[in-house]
């Protein structure tokens, strides 16, 4: 096989990519080539041994992918990008844009205007359950819907057990001695004995 493009040049100075481009240009648009066939034609033209081609094969394949003048056509077929109009090229990039439309939208983070970018400040606003308006009614309506009597019975039994220990009517606040550590303690109430 002779390539007219390289007439007068030494074959040892040619790169595999240059030869691949020349082979595909000479064959024409409707004659895409499988990668193996392309490598065999390059080997025959450059008159290289199998070991030389195998050593250069990873670099050649990388160059084929990186070089903008080649295009993979699927099923390991290759062609020249110049053969195809931009509208004809249906690459993975187009399908990725379609996938982004189905992706869930990220929620915007709420910003507290009073935090002023203080990194050490603790924001208690978002973790307080009382701030949420998710409570449908009073506290008594929060019992389990399946067995509301179970939780009510537990609360009532707990209250009755506490009343058995110290009934409410026996509690006198006057009998309770306050220590110095108590909040209601004051120096005026202490009587020296």
Curated annotation (Swiss-Prot):
- Locate the region Disordered: 117-193
Give the UniProt entry's GO cellular component terms.
DNA-directed RNA polymerase complex
* Annotated PROSITE patterns: HTH_HARE (PS51913)
Q: In terms of domain of life, where is this protein from? A: Bacteria
Gene Ontology molecular functions: DNA-directed RNA polymerase activity
Q: List where Acidic residues composition bias occurs.
A: 117-134, 142-193
Q: Name one Pfam family in it.
A: HARE-HTH
Can you give the residue ranges of the HTH HARE-type domain? 14-83
Q: How does it assemble?
A: RNAP is composed of a core of 2 alpha, a beta and a beta' subunits. The core is associated with a delta subunit and one of several sigma factors.
Question: Which purpose does this protein serve, as stated in its record?
Answer: Participates in both the initiation and recycling phases of transcription. In the presence of the delta subunit, RNAP displays an increased specificity of transcription, a decreased affinity for nucleic acids, and an increased efficiency of RNA synthesis because of enhanced recycling.
For this entry, the protein name equals Probable DNA-directed RNA polymerase subunit delta
């Amino acid at each position: 096989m002779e390539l007219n493009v390289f007439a007068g040049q030494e074959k040892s100075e040619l790169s595999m990519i240059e030869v691949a481009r020349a082979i595909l240009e000479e064959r024409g648009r409707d004659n895409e080539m499988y990668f193996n066939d392309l490598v065999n034609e390059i080997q025959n033209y450059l008159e290289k041994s199998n070991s030389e081609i195998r050593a250069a094969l990873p670099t050649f394949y990388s160059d084929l992918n990186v070089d903008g003048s080649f295009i993979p056509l699927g099923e390991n077929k290759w062609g020249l990008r110049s053969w195809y109009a931009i509208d004809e090229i249906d690459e993975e990039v187009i399908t990725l844009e379609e996938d982004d439309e189905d992706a869930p939208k990220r929620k915007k983070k709420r910003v507290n205007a009073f935090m002023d970018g203080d990194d050490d400040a603790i924001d208690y606003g978002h973790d307080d359950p009382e701030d949420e308006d998710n409570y449908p009614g009073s506290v008594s309506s929060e019992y389990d819907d399946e067995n509301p009597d179970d939780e009510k019975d537990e609360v009532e039994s707990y209250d009755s057990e506490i009343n058995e220990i110290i009934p409410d009517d026996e509690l006198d606040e006057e009998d309770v001695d306050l220590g110095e550590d108590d909040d209601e303690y004051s120096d005026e109430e202490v009587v020296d004995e």
